[in-house]
Amino acid sequence: MTFSVDKVRADFPVLSREVNGLPLAYLDSAASAQKPGQVIDAEAEFYRHGYAAVHRGIHTLSAQATEKMENVRKQASLFINARSAEELVFVRGTTEGINLVANSWGNSNVRAGDNIIISQMEHHANIVPWQMLCARVGAELRVIPLNPDGTLQLETLPTLFDEKTRLLAITHVSNVLGTENPLAEMITLAHQHGAKVLVDGAQAVMHHLVDVQALDCDFYVFSGHKLYGPTGIGILYVKEALLQEMPPWEGGGSMIATVSLSEGTTWTKAPWRFEAGTPNTGGIIGLGAALEYVSALGLNNIAEYEQNLMHYALSQLESVPDLTLYGPQNRLGVIAFNLGKHHAYDVGSFLDNYGIAVRTGHHCAMPLMAYYNVPAMCRASLAMYNTHEEVDRLVTGLQRIHRLLG
């Protein structure tokens, strides 16, 4: 299938609107991607004509909704090449998925004196849950340091592992720098030391194929809203043997087998024992539509288009005076930058006046900001619906801001 950005853009209603009297150039998909009409329509259709509470319902609507929900679980398992759909837990997003692992697997397997390894480039969602776990049990949090070019100091990694290392929690792709970490060698090293590996895939799954079996990671988590799906839904993959051993971390309906005031409660089997309460069924349906949409386009086609666009953007940005870029030359999805000594908020505000949407701030990565000794950065993210013309508008906008502000 030939990739056509014009055809893709036609599927996204919001891209036809104007901001401040100018066509919207949406360069903030790494924060949250826009939704194609196919996703919007699928979720709306479910609420119009198919909504019902899932599980245990004897009536037709409930049975159909349950079947649709479980079909999306199967669809998502194929999307990341899991061995079984029952290795996938529906969560609210990447943050909840990581917290689930920290509170279920972590509480059961990490003890005083143990250690967990993360990196200096992690999103707060892959830092704070491990800090909280370590504080609870008296474990140590170890950190892989950064290089100035935005890659990790991988030569230090072997020195961080020891017989007390229980987990390596690492991002697949940095949400600020676009760095893609060499997961295969990192996972192999962790397993050689008897440690498990959790991968934060929030910034990876929309850019290229992910094969959890080939990676051999123990946990992989991602959100739907960055993958052109709805908010409030994500996927946590856990190797089956691990998932079966993990206790639930939330109690309520749907996750029990029996409840007795005198005998206590027994849990249903995984993955359903991790899905307490009424699920976000509409979001799950929308996620299924997003997976179908991206799969039909072909992730290899998307990756090729986006990489060409990234190379073009990096080359064009070289023409902007006093522009500092952060991250390696080879990157996925995002370009973080600052313009002279101007605060990122000021630059972002000017760009918004030009109809260009970028993200500004610390990007939930304060340790990374501290490493580069800046309070904030601007971040432009490139998605499959962005164009060379939008890149040109960004470059022209930055040049204009430089002339105005000096």
Curated annotation (Swiss-Prot):
Gene3D superfamilies: Aspartate Aminotransferase, domain 1, Type I PLP-dependent aspartate aminotransferase-like (Major domain). Transmembrane segments: none annotated. The keyword Phosphoprotein does not apply. It comes from the Bacteria. Pfam families: Aminotran_5. Its main location: cytoplasm. Its cofactor is pyridoxal 5'-phosphate. The modification N6-(pyridoxal phosphate)lysine is found at residue 226. GO terms for biological process: cysteine metabolic process. GO terms for molecular function: cysteine desulfurase activity; pyridoxal phosphate binding; selenocysteine lyase activity. Its EC number is 2.8.1.7, 4.4.1.16. GO terms for cellular component: cytoplasm. Pathway: Cofactor biosynthesis; iron-sulfur cluster biosynthesis. It is found in: Cytoplasm. The active site is at residue 364. Keywords: Cytoplasm, Lyase, Pyridoxal phosphate, Transferase. It catalyses: (sulfur carrier)-H + L-cysteine = (sulfur carrier)-SH + L-alanine; L-selenocysteine + AH2 = hydrogenselenide + L-alanine + A + H(+). Cysteine desulfurases mobilize the sulfur from L-cysteine to yield L-alanine, an essential step in sulfur metabolism for biosynthesis of a variety of sulfur-containing biomolecules. Component of the suf operon, which is activated and required under specific conditions such as oxidative stress and iron limitation. Acts as a potent selenocysteine lyase in vitro, that mobilizes selenium from L-selenocysteine. Selenocysteine lyase activity is however unsure in vivo. PANTHER family: CYSTEINE DESULFURASE. NCBIfam families: PRK09295.1, sufS. Belongs to the class-V pyridoxal-phosphate-dependent aminotransferase family. Csd subfamily. Homodimer. Interacts with SufE and the SufBCD complex composed of SufB, SufC and SufD. The interaction with SufE is required to mediate the direct transfer of the sulfur atom from the S-sulfanylcysteine. This is Cysteine desulfurase. It comes from Escherichia coli O9:H4 (strain HS). The gene is sufS.
